[in-house]
A protein has these predicted regions:
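Asp-based, Mg2+/Mn2+-dependent phosphohydrolase catalytic module
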Residues: 52-56, 60, 69-194
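Helix-loop "lid/cap" segments that line or gate small-molecule binding pockets
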Residues: 9-24, 76, 111, 147
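Active-site neighborhood of HAD-like aspartate-dependent phosphohydrolases
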Residues: 1-3
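Hydrophobic alpha-helical core bundles mediating ligand binding, dimerization, or RNAP-core interactions
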Residues: 6, 10, 14, 30-38, ...
Length: 194
């Protein structure tokens, strides 16, 4: 059940649970669950090993794209001190689109706001919903499987959803970005030659 919920909005998770149960959830269930999650994240969330160095090493335009609420994303970036590594990057959340991931709308919005064609965007995602969304938007996707909440079957699920490569540890991000950039250069050279 956790692997199915990964990357979904709280409201969508609760809808799914309601379909599996005979119990009626209270009207404020989503808000109560979000508040409990955010309180726990504030106490327990830590940065993924190597993520600060990996992000800091990339001299490329960046954005944060999440199905979480904006307040949760901002708090998580502050708690993990990733806001320092990322700098002043745009943040896109499910609140900004009618249909959250796995719909590609949020990734299309991010590409548009960055002024970058989706085909020239590289995404790092840990959820099937996120990989599905980014892939459907026409982006190249790295499936990250180095977080503590990831199970052993997640790499296969991410590849099936459209991930281009699997990243087990953030120390490998720079090499995958370099490989992707070489691929883009090859495409550019082919287009110029034609």
């Amino acid at each position: 059940l956790l692997s199915q919920a990964l990357g979904m909005t709280t409201a969508d998770i609760l809808k799914h649970l309601a379909q599996l149960s005979r119990h009626q959830l209270p009207p404020d269930a989503s808000e109560r669950v979000d508040s409990a999650i955010e309180a726990r994240l504030a106490r327990e969330l830590t940065a993924i090993a190597g993520v600060h160095d990996a992000v800091s090493s990339l001299d490329l335009p960046k954005a944060v794209v999440s199905n979480s609420r904006r307040c949760r994303v901002l708090a998580s970036l502050a708690t993990t001190q990733l806001e320092e590594a990322l700098g002043d990057v745009p943040i896109f959340t499910a609140e900004q689109v009618d249909n959250p991931k796995p719909d590609p709308a949020i990734y299309r919005l991010a590409a548009h706001e960055l002024g970058c064609p989706p085909s020239r965007c590289l995404v790092v995602e840990d959820s099937v919903a996120g990989v599905t969304a980014a892939h459907a938007a026409g982006m190249r996707v790295i499936g990250f499987v180095g977080a503590s909440h990831i199970d052993d079957e997640q790499p296969d699920r991410l590849l099936a959803a459209g991930a281009w490569r699997i990243l087990p540890h953030m120390r490998g991000l720079r090499a995958l970005v370099d490989e992707w950039q070489l691929h883009l250069q090859g495409q550019d050279n082919n287009e110029t030659a034609q």
